[in-house]
């Protein structure tokens, strides 16, 4: 049996988590197991839908499906909020951010359904026109109203409404962080498609697999993720609750919750979402540049500290125009310089900056180097990097000072190739990383391990430990059946021990720990696994009939021609 010190309350830094998604079913796609586990632990989960999911279907059916999902996930209806904007209009919202959008059914203001009011009508005293600006306004209002300890939101997926939601959430958070110096929620982003809804179907493998990417759903194959400013290697992995690891497919709450969204036939994607971990990317909110004054020798520098690393206006383009999201110095500026001024002496330790997206074939559009100068006389030259590996990501740069320094200002002078459109989209400056590790988890063959059976013809898995933050490991140790052991010896010892029965492997100390059971499988284990897979496939076929009926019933809510 697997045991862990992991607590959602510790990981999120409090009791309240807000999940913000564009459509009804995306809550399961990006955070299903996390929502279930957090509620099970007693946390308040607040769910926010940006759109009514009403492009093909009337909002009524999508609301009814949410009510069914909430029962499965034990999510109180009072914690669910519908912003009430239209589905499918991300392109229109982003391309002209002040204009009012009109839904094909004639709606042009936020509204609810099924006797449920939209958020603005209920809390802000009026419905809102369908504009991008009002989406940001509503998001800002709901975040400040509840002030969650953590915010989980969708990131730049291939769907236009996902891009819209990601950009609007980040803009709202940027506005809030600039106004509220003390409120710094933990912000986590995730993808709904390549890692979840359209991920790899590995449910029937011998072991519970961790989240993987389906690279076919990455819009540019040279990118690490669908957001060029996020690296796959930088993802945060967290364990999933036992119920969401249920090996009986139709009893797993993730499968059942997806099944409640019958108009979308979401149940079909259930096996892809049931994994041994859930992955997120953290956007730190302790960036001191957000509260600094930034000036530039040329160009519009307002984008440099708005919390948005990658903005898009024309979603029909695979790569956004640099002018849409980055500071671009004038071509005649021979010494383009940004100056970040603080209102008081500030301790800094690290600078991250994010350049406009470019590739090897487009090298003239990349910065050639940066010179950093500080008010205390320090000068550092950061050359253009050479990137032999895809994962190295040439448009994300970091400089870490040898020791924390106290400064009043920082100046960054950039060199760029002539005629190139090179610039910086965001600057993030950090005093020091206050985050502390909240958990560790044993990993076998790169998979989050819970209980592990070594089946016939399988080798002993490679074992290491995952941490959610830098960890002082001086008092952390492995043990087998209660006896301390070094990792190198352990890998030689386990094959001998499992010949005599299951062993319990533990890593950690008294406060942070994880333990799992490992055993050598026999013919009965192999047959049992095959029988379980056959049972799951058979029950899945039976369930399809029920879900088809639900899908057919939902068609009466479908707009004609859609």
Enumerate the predicted regions with their spans.
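C-terminal accessory domains and tails appended to enzymatic cores
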Residues: 2-4, 11, 92-99, 105, ...
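Active-site beta-strand->loop->alpha-helix modules in alpha/beta enzyme cores, enriched
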Residues: 1-182
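Aromatic, loop-rich ligand-recognition surfaces of beta-strand-rich domains
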Residues: 319-379, 393-438
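Membrane-proximal basic amphipathic "stem/tether" segments
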Residues: 1, 524-562
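Short, compositionally biased P/S/T/A/G/V-rich stretches that sit at domain boundaries
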Residues: 435-457, 529-531
């Amino acid at each position: 049996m697997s045991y862990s010190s992991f607590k959602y309350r510790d990981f999120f830094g409090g009791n309240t988590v807000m999940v913000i998604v564009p459509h009804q079913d995306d809550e399961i796609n990006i955070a299903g197991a996390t929502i279930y586990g957090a509620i099970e632990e007693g946390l308040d989960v607040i769910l926010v839908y940006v759109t009514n999911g009403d492009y093909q279907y009337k909002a009524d059916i999508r609301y009814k499906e949410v009510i069914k999902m909430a029962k499965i996930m034990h999510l109180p209806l009072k914690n669910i909020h519908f912003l009430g904007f239209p589905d499918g209009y991300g392109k229109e919202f982003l391309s002209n951010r002040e204009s009012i959008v009109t839904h094909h059914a004639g709606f042009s203001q936020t509204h609810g359904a099924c006797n449920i009011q939209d958020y603005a009508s209920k809390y802000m005293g009026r419905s809102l026109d369908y504009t991008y600006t009002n989406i940001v306004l509503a998001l800002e209002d709901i975040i400040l109203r509840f002030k969650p300890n953590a915010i989980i939101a969708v990131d730049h997926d291939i769907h236009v409404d996902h891009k819209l939601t990601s950009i609007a959430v980040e803009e709202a958070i940027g506005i809030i962080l600039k106004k509220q110096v003390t409120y710094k929620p933990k912000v986590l982003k995730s993808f709904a498609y390549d890692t979840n809804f359209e991920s790899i179907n590995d449910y029937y493998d011998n072991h519970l697999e961790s989240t993987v990417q389906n690279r076919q759903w990455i819009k540019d194959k040279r990118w690490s993720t669908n957001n060029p400013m996020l690296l796959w290697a930088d993802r945060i992995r967290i364990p999933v609750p036992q119920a969401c690891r249920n090996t009986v497919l139709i009893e797993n709450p993730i499968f059942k919750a997806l099944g409640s969204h019958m108009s979308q036939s979401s149940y079909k994607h259930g096996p892809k979402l049931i994994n041994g971990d859930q992955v997120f990317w953290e956007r730190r909110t302790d960036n001191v540049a957000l509260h600094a004054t930034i000036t530039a020798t040329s160009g519009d520098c307002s984008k440099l500290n708005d919390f948005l690393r990658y903005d898009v206006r024309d979603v029909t383009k695979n790569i956004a125009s640099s002018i849409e999201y980055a500071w671009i110095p004038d071509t005649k500026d021979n010494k383009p310089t940004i100056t970040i001024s603080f209102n008081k002496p500030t301790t800094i330790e690290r600078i991250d900056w994010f350049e406009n997206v470019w590739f090897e074939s487009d090298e003239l559009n990349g910065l050639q180097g940066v010179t950093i100068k500080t008010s205390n006389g320090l000068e550092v030259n950061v050359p253009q990097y050479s990137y032999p590996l895809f994962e190295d990501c040439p448009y994300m740069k970091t400089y870490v000072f040898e020791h924390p320094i106290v400064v009043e200002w920082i100046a960054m002078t950039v060199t760029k190739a002539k005629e190139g459109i090179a610039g910086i989209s965001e600057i993030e400056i950090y005093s020091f990383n206050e985050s502390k590790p909240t958990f560790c988890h044993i990993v076998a063959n790169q998979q989050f391990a819970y209980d592990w059976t070594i089946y016939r013809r399988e080798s002993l898995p490679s074992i290491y430990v995952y941490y959610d933050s830098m960890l002082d490991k001086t008092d952390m140790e492995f043990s087998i059946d209660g006896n301390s052991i070094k990792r190198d010896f352990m890998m030689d010892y386990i094959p001998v021990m499992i010949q005599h029965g299951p062993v319990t492997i533990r890593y950690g100390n008294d406060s942070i720990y994880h333990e799992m059971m490992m055993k050598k499988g026999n013919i009965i284990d192999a047959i049992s696994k095959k029988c379980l897979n056959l049972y799951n496939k058979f029950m899945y076929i039976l369930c399809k009939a029920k879900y088809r009926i639900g899908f057919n019933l939902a068609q009466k809510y479908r707009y004609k021609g859609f």
